[in-house]
Regions:
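Switch/communication elements of ASCE P-loop NTPase nucleotide-binding domains
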Residues: 1-58, 243-373
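Phosphate-coordinating catalytic segments in nucleotide- and nucleic-acid-processing enzymes
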Residues: 50-266, 270, 333, 338-373
Length: 373
């Protein structure tokens, strides 16, 4: 089982010298806007990614998934220090896990090259290069080239691999590999398969339907149905036998199914959920969250949940049942990220406060503790 105990982000995107330890089963990542919550979740993914550009692309694309035409190279370069103005680039993340140390480091140089040279050095196939020359209308006078290496450590095994890409690259070839950890973006429920792991598992399917009925009691079944053009649609069957495509339902039902689907994927691993409140009305938090946490425990899934919603935080803390039990282990940790001045804070530009769910619950109750700042 993949389980994160601590992490050090020496350099990644806008985060410098951030160290957090003492993670638990359910970890809430909170903080002000632009405090690094999504970057933190990306850092965890990068630690477990395969040392290849195609795996890195799958992480960088998460921010721009709705806008598929965004440049891979631009997203890739922004993984390094966003304020770094020198040619030499580097990022480094390390962590202690239940299976030993993990570490990833990207080191390289960005430089300008002639447009013709960039085409030849790009990841495009020979056919794509010819198509680019013929269809683009013009070849840029200069382009950017990154050359470097990825160094990864998993336990006692260290791997080093040379990489390169140009600002003309968009499609990055590489084998499709099973991910070790899993991520739910704030808008993932709008575009990904929602039933993949549910419809073929009767027990899991019945659980999903029972949850959906609390949103809409007319729901009787969920399945794939074949349309007239031969495609398969994700559909809901009502108790009156009416076949309704998911497209006519709101985001809440899609978000629930997406979370349940990804939980199954993340069995014996880590699941990160960005902005868990997106698409969900707050009145359903108390119904959904206990089911998600109970399933995560059953499936051995460690959760990292980013949110800026105080209502979501309070609903998650209710799961701790702090009024009725006393025990040493608290399954909930609340990690608050906050921007600071690196010149004052020994080079760190973001610091973390890590406290137990019970601490936040007690202080919210007595002092109206603001955990997000």
């Amino acid at each position: 089982m993949a389980y994160l105990k601590s992490i050090e982000i020496n350099q990644f995107r806008g985060i410098q010298e951030l160290s957090i330890s003492g993670f638990s089963d359910i970890n809430l990542i909170v903080g002000d806007n632009n405090s690094g919550k999504t970057t933190f979740l990306e850092a965890i993914q990068l630690l477990f990614a395969k040392p290849q550009l195609s795996s890195i692309k799958s992480i960088t694309n998460q921010r721009t998934a709705i806008h598929s035409n965004n440049s891979f190279y631009t997203s890739f370069i922004k993984m390094f220090n966003v304020e770094q103005d020198k040619e030499d680039l580097d990022l480094e993340i390390s962590a202690k896990c239940n299976d030993g140390m993990r570490r990833v480091e990207l080191i390289g140089v960005e430089k300008a090259v002639a447009g013709e040279d960039a085409i030849q050095l790009s990841k495009m196939s020979n056919r794509q290069k010819e198509q680019y020359k013929g269809s683009s209308g013009f070849i840029p006078e200069t382009a950017k080239l990154f050359e470097g290496k990825i160094v990864t450590q998993c336990g006692k095994k260290t791997t080093e691999k040379k990489i390169s890409c140009t600002s003309l690259d968009n499609g990055i070839p590489g084998p499709i590999v099973k991910k070790e950890v899993f991520y739910i973006s704030s808008f993932g429920h709008l575009r990904y398969d929602l039933l993949q792991n549910i419809v073929d598992n009767p027990e899991y399917k019945n659980l999903a339907i029972s949850i959906l009925k609390q949103f809409d009691d007319s729901i009787a079944d969920i399945c794939y149905t074949k349309a007239d053009d031969g495609t398969y649609l994700e559909s809901i069957i009502t108790k009156n036998g009416v076949n309704m495509p998911f497209s006519v339902y709101g985001d809440g039902i899609k978000k629930i199914l997406y979370i349940l689907n990804k939980l199954f994927d993340a069995t014996d691993s880590i699941l990160m959920i960005d902005e868990i409140e997106t698409g969900l009305h707050k009145k359903y938090y108390s119904t959904l969250f206990p089911v998600v946490f109970a399933l995560a425990k059953k499936l051995n899934v460690q959760l990292f949940i980013a949110t800026h919603s105080m209502e979501a935080i309070e609903a998650i803390l209710e799961y701790g049942n702090y009024e009725n039990k006393v025990k040493d282990h608290d399954s909930i940790k609340v990690i608050t990220l906050k921007k600071v001045n690196p010149e004052i804070d020994h080079g760190s530009n973001i610091v973390a406060r890590n406290v137990t769910g019970k601490y936040v619950y007690d202080n919210r109750k007595v002092f109206d503790f603001e955990v997000r700042l």
